[in-house]
Amino acid sequence: MRELTVQTDCGLIKGMEENGALAWKGIPYAQPPVRFSAPQPVEKWSGVRDGTRFGPSCPQENEKRAPMAEDCLYLNIWSPDTEGARPVMFFIHGGSFAGGSASEPAYNGANLAQKEDVVVVTVNYRVGILGFLDFSFLDEAFRPNCGLLDILEALRW
């Protein structure tokens, strides 16, 4: 398996070859989230980040999606193993905003990237009460729909 290191605006990420595509997993797109607050842009890192494993799923009732952690704002990228610009498919997992994870096997983008010649991006975002509970009536510092704000931050990354 060939390992690949790429330079991003935030730092170096080591990826790998997977089923004929290039893959970088577990890339942070925001700072570890503060409960019920909008995500903050990720800071630059030094050294090389390991992009060969998925980041944790966001906390939810479905225990089958372990490991889970509140520090869950990570995305995954699969690209064809060819030069040149490609269209990007940004995939937001389902789950009625209550559950789901970008690391589910059904959302592995390697085959789609290789066969359809697109770059595939999957993203974790806060779900359930951590992503969509509205406390703004108590304090304006709380933001409703943090999960949607997470998705917007991933698109900005």
Segments (PLM) and residue ranges:
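Non-catalytic accessory segments of hydrolases
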Residues: 1-148
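Short, well-ordered amphipathic alpha-helical segments that serve as non-catalytic structural scaffolds
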Residues: 151-157
